[in-house]
Structure formats: C-alpha cells, structure tokens
Regions:
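Hydrophobic h-region of N-terminal signal peptides that target proteins for export
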Residues: 32-42
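Short alpha-helix boundary/capping segments
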Residues: 7-9, 31-32
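Bacterial N-terminal signal peptides that target proteins for export
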Residues: 19-30
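Carbohydrate-interacting regions of secretory-pathway proteins
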Residues: 42-261
Length: 261
C-alpha cells in the first residue's frame, strides 16, 4: 500500500550514548543567544510561497504541495509494497542561489523513514529519480537515533551525533577526517523526548564561517567547528531530501531564511 500521506498529501550509521554534564544548560542558552544576535540585523528571505513549488526543482511525481506544506513521498514498489520504488536518495532543490552564512528555521513532520535539509551543498549528476546532492545535512527521521545530527551526504558521513560538540580536523594523508569530541551541548534522551512523533517540529540551522549548529524544538542538538578546510563547504545549495528505503511521507513548511550581512 502507499504510505498514508500526512494530512492527505499526494547506508548504515551508528550511534553512541550521550551523557549530560552540569554545564550543559548554560552552554545551550549561550549558544542559542549568540545565534540570535548574529543574525538579528539581517533580512528574512521567502523561499516557499505556501502554494506551489515555484522556485524549487525536483521530481514532480515525488514532490508536491499539500495543505500549505511541501510534501515528499517515497512510493511503494508494486512488486513489493513494503519497499520504496526509488533506488537512490533524491532532493527538491531551492533555485534561489548559493547560501553561505545563514540561519534557517522551518517546521517538519515525517511518517516513516529518514529525511533532512541539505545546506552548503552541491548538485551532482541527476539520477533516475531526480536531483542528487552532496553536502551538509540537518538530519531527521521517524526513528529515535538521528534527528538533529550533522551528516554529510555523499561526503564525510556523520560529523556529529546528537548532543555532541565536535571539531573536524583534516585526516592524515588524505584519509577520513579526525573528529575531536569537545564535550556536549545536549542530552540525547532529552532531545529525543522533545520530538513529536508524526507531528510538527521546529528545526533551526545556524551556519557562520566554519561553525554550524542545529536545534530542534529549541534544544541544541549539535555544535561543529569544521577545520577540514579542503572539504568543508563554505556556501552552497539548500535542498530537501527524500530517502530511499521503505515508503514514507515528509512535509516542510514555515521556512524562514536569514542570510548574514
């Protein structure tokens, strides 16, 4: 069967436990305040009109607008309805230009599967099911492990698990980058407990220089300083993901993009 649409719309990862520390609450508050101040005097840019996909590019069989929200689906495979029909991750790409330093807030909800928002990303050769994107991803899912992490699609993989404050350093002799763990910005279990299943959640991404932060429902989920200069993207595209795998539905709305001046 087709995955039930929300409001009637048309590679292996690991995880690790995160333990809280006494300074976590103060660190989270200061980080959130800094992010707000950094973009306080910039102008907000509209990237979604709430009606149609004007300004966006992707596979129109997979992306549409339902009830004021961008809606993406992974349809079932007719030969095996438990499996999705798409064979690679694909994306809806915002065609409004390259974005470097910015703050992006949006709401999402997801039924089954995995999704995310790409930023500072680049478009690769399109696949059978639409655009293919590489770059930073603000990950989220219907499950309990990955919402809020920093993942680099078709790149360096997981750069920070939920709750981590990391510095990414260049690898030796061109090998995978070294990830220095500098403490915690949030408690893994507490962050997950604040995420509403199959309901609307607010996601915020802050990117300034080589420093990126994610927040879900006001709780900071990662803090990363990317010193791997050969691989760290400084600007790029914004895009929304449909993940290969089981049938799923994901929705996005209420985007607020503020670019730093």
């Amino acid at each position: 069967m087709v995955a039930k649409a929300i409001d009637n719309p048309a590679p292996s990862r690991y995880t690790s436990p995160v333990q809280p520390n006494p300074s976590m609450k103060l660190s989270h508050t200061l980080a959130a305040l800094f992010a707000v101040v950094s973009f306080a005097h910039a102008d907000e840019k509209e990237i979604f009109n709430g009606k149609d996909l004007t300004g966006w590019e992707g596979n129109k069989d997979l992306w549409s607008v339902k009830d004021g929200a961008i809606t993406g689906i992974t349809p079932p495979d007719p030969a095996d309805p438990k499996k999705g029909i798409i064979k690679h991750n694909t994306f809806l790409v915002w065609k409004g230009g390259m974005v470097g330093d910015f703050e992006l807030t949006f709401q999402y909800r997801i039924e089954k599967g995995n999704s995310g928002v790409q930023y500072r990303s680049k478009e690769l050769t399109p696949g059978e099911f639409g655009p293919i994107i590489s770059g930073y991803q603000a990950d989220f899912e219907a499950g309990d492990k990955y919402s809020g992490i920093l993942y680099e699609e078709r790149g360096r993989g997981i750069l920070a698990l939920r709750g981590e404050k990391n510095t990414i350093k260049p690898g030796v002799d061109g090998k995978k980058p070294e990830i220095a763990k500098n403490g915690l910005v949030g408690d893994n279990a507490a962050i997950q407990a604040a995420i509403k299943k199959e309901d609307w959640n607010e996601y915020r991404i802050v990117a300034k220089g080589n420093h990126v932060q994610h927040f879900i429902n006001g709780m900071q989920t990662i803090d990363v300083t990317d010193e791997d200069t050969a691989n760290a993207p400084k600007e790029g595209l914004l895009a929304l993901q449909i993940h290969q795998g089981p049938p799923m539905v994901v929705q996005f709305k209420n985007f607020k993009l503020v670019e730093s001046k």
